[in-house]
């Protein structure tokens, strides 16, 4: 009986099998990633439209609810109508779209920040457009802005607790 021979070398199947598994897992993950990216794109694409009953203007939607509310409550009402909505930030083009939506006074998203001595939009956007009536703003206790119902449809400062119609806005992306 002699010394036993060494067994023949075993092929490196474990490494090969592991490599195949990693390659297959990577391919599956790549496919899943593509599906998820498509779902995200479709989801956001689906949100890039105005809800029924809202007026479309360029990249914005506008709506004047039937109820009247204080300026602050109006914020919440807009958000309940659509999570993307807030009181409207009005520029020159928007003014022409918004005016016919109500024949009554309506809050817009502009208020006076006394701490910074500046008028600010509810969405923190900046616009040089102002449509103040000649004598406005005229009262330091009136910190919120509305479009007046008169023939001029210009802006007036009013007490934020007063209840008026209001215009909500959604900015489409």
Curated annotation (Swiss-Prot):
One of its GO terms (molecular function) is carbohydrate binding. Disulfide bonds join 47-61, 78-168, 144-160. This is Lectin BRA-2. Glycans are attached at residue 39. Sugar-binding protein which recognizes specific carbohydrate structures and agglutinates a variety of animal cells by binding to cell-surface glycoproteins and glycolipids. Calcium-dependent lectin. Invertebrate lectins may be involved in defense functions. Homohexamer; disulfide-linked. This lectin binds galactose.
């Amino acid at each position: 009986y002699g010394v036993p021979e060494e067994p023949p070398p075993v092929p490196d199947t474990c490494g090969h099998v592991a490599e195949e598994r990693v390659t297959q897992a990577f391919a599956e993950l790549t496919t899943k990633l593509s599906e998820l990216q498509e779902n995200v794109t479709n989801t956001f694409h689906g949100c890039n439209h105005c809800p029924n009953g809202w007026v479309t203007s360029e990249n914005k939607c506008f709506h004047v609810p039937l109820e009247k509310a204080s300026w602050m409550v109006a914020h919440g009402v807009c958000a309940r109508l659509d999570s993307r909505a807030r009181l409207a930030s009005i520029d020159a083009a928007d003014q022409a779209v918004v005016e016919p939506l109500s024949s009554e006074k309506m809050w817009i998203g502009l208020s006076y920040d006394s701490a910074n001595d500046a008028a600010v939009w509810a969405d923190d956007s900046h616009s040089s457009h102002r449509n103040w009536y000649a004598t406005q703003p005229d009262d330091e206790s009136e910190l919120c802005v509305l479009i007046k119902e008169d023939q001029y449809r210009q802006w007036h400062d009013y007490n934020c607790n007063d209840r008026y119609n209001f215009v909500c806005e959604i900015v489409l992306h």
